[in-house]
């Protein structure tokens, strides 16, 4: 199984809520509140996702200043893919300085 990690790849409400429901986070997130979920996605400025083919299997959803602080709010991995290191890789990629530098340059003009 090849897992592809993407930075700030656009995901739909359906993909995000589907993943939350397939992980243990669905029980603790407002998955039925469309406006809230849309705000959660839209207002996150760092989203690291894990994909197997076209299937979203993991997400690290963050708010960051791209220089010093990063708050990782949601870390979700589909239960069918847990215990394979995907969550750990999502955290590693979330902390990867090269992504911070590249994204910070896009934001600041």
Predicted segment positions?
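Short amphipathic alpha-helix that is part of the acyltransferase structural core
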Residues: 1-31
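Short, basic/aromatic recognition patches
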Residues: 31-37
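A short helix-loop-beta-strand connector motif used in the catalytic cores of GNAT acetyltransferases and
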Residues: 38-49
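Conserved acetyl-CoA-binding loop-helix of GNAT-fold acetyltransferases
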Residues: 77, 83-97
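Conserved GNAT acetyl-CoA-binding A-motif
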Residues: 91, 97-109
């Amino acid at each position: 199984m090849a897992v592809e990690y993407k930075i700030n790849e656009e995901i739909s409400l359906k993909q995000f809520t589907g993943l939350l429901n397939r992980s243990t986070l669905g029980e603790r997130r407002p998955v039925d509140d469309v406006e809230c979920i849309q705000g959660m996605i839209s207002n996150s400025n760092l989203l690291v996702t894990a994909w197997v083919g076209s299937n979203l299997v993991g997400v690290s959803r963050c708010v960051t200043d791209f220089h010093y602080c990063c708050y990782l709010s949601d870390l979700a991995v589909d239960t069918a893919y847990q215990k394979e290191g995907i969550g750990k890789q999502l955290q590693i990629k979330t902390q990867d300085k090269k992504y911070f530098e590249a994204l910070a340059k896009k934001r600041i003009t």
